[in-house]
């Protein structure tokens, strides 16, 4: 994975329904959610690791619940987002993704 821009293709990048199924099993991983809400560490390495784990916690549930099978922003509450970016850069016309590090709400417009 990587820190900026769109969600890593292995997880959700432009995820079509056919690609959504493999990550759906991770959708309710409690340990990942717990790590995602942990305080931001001072170590850049830990920040990177947590951001990757948080991407599973936030992007995977969206893949499991979004009506169109796309990776919608945090927890899948946005109906028509194209791909849930890792750090909150959303498609403005469809919804914004909550940042991966500890924010649990999507801003839906």
UniProtKB/Swiss-Prot annotation:
<feature type="repeat" description="1">
    <location>
        <begin position="7"/>
        <end position="10"/>
    </location>
</feature>
<dbReference type="GO" id="GO:0042302">
    <property type="term" value="F:structural constituent of cuticle"/>
</dbReference>
<feature type="repeat" description="3">
    <location>
        <begin position="20"/>
        <end position="23"/>
    </location>
</feature>
<comment type="function">
    <text>Component of the cuticle of migratory locust which contains more than 100 different structural proteins.</text>
</comment>
<keyword id="KW-0193">Cuticle</keyword>
<protein>
    <recommendedName>
        <fullName>Cuticle protein 10.6</fullName>
    </recommendedName>
</protein>
<feature type="repeat" description="8">
    <location>
        <begin position="97"/>
        <end position="100"/>
    </location>
</feature>
<feature type="repeat" description="6">
    <location>
        <begin position="71"/>
        <end position="74"/>
    </location>
</feature>
<feature type="repeat" description="2">
    <location>
        <begin position="15"/>
        <end position="18"/>
    </location>
</feature>
<keyword id="KW-0677">Repeat</keyword>
<feature type="repeat" description="5">
    <location>
        <begin position="59"/>
        <end position="62"/>
    </location>
</feature>
<feature type="repeat" description="4">
    <location>
        <begin position="29"/>
        <end position="32"/>
    </location>
</feature>
<feature type="repeat" description="7">
    <location>
        <begin position="83"/>
        <end position="86"/>
    </location>
</feature>
């Amino acid at each position: 994975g990587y820190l900026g821009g769109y969600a890593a293709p292995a997880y959700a990048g432009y995820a079509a329904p056919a690609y959504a199924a493999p990550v759906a099993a991770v959708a309710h991983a409690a340990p990942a959610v717990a790590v995602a809400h942990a305080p931001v560490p001072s170590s850049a390495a830990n920040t990177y690791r947590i951001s990757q784990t948080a991407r599973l916690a936030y992007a995977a549930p969206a893949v499991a619940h979004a009506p169109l099978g796309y990776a919608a922003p945090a927890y899948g509450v946005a109906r028509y987002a194209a791909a849930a970016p890792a750090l909150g850069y959303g498609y403005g016309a469809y919804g914004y993704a909550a940042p991966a590090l500890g924010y649990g709400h999507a801003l839906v417009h």
